[in-house]
Amino acid sequence: MSFGYQVLGFGSGGGGVVYEVTYLVVAGGAGGGAGGGGGAGGFRTSEDSSPMEIEAGDYTITVGSGSGPVPGNDSSPRAGNSVFNTITSTGGGGSGYGNPEEDGGSGGVQNGLGNTPPVTPSQGNNGGPQIQSGGGGASQAGQDNSPAGGAGGNGRDSSVSGSSVEYAGGGGGGGYIPNTAPGPARDGGGAGGSRTG
């Protein structure tokens, strides 16, 4: 699911006036499932390339929502995409046990692919290799720490808002064996859960 907002207005509309816009577009992060951490939403910014040139007018921005956790061994679905003009960041890939990995901006566990669909520069990284690994983040793949939960992949910093803030970290994995430590969160991702029995 995504939400649309008409939030940008430059000038009175039309007239051929061109503006340079600095942007940061981060998609929704995915929920975890059956021990694995969810992948972060895709991270795309003009700081990696150059400002976007757009004409005066109204623009709709779509903000991708996160996907929640799921019970049992099912995979959490991919989260929502975020869109600004020609820039689309893909929602993070969900995680589950014994189910196909979810690809996305950053991938879910069991090697879910990040940067899907591929863009340059990359919008994210792969999920960790095991069911209790962390989800991928904007600057690092999800980590494995078997049998404890793996850390989510690191996110990235952006100064678009005027100060440096970390975004798009992967979710931590849950311990596969009861009473093992969960994986820590990274840069906006959620920490893993604990299994007690």
Where are the language model's segments positioned?
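Low-complexity, glycine/proline-biased repetitive segments and flexible coils/loops
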Residues: 2-197
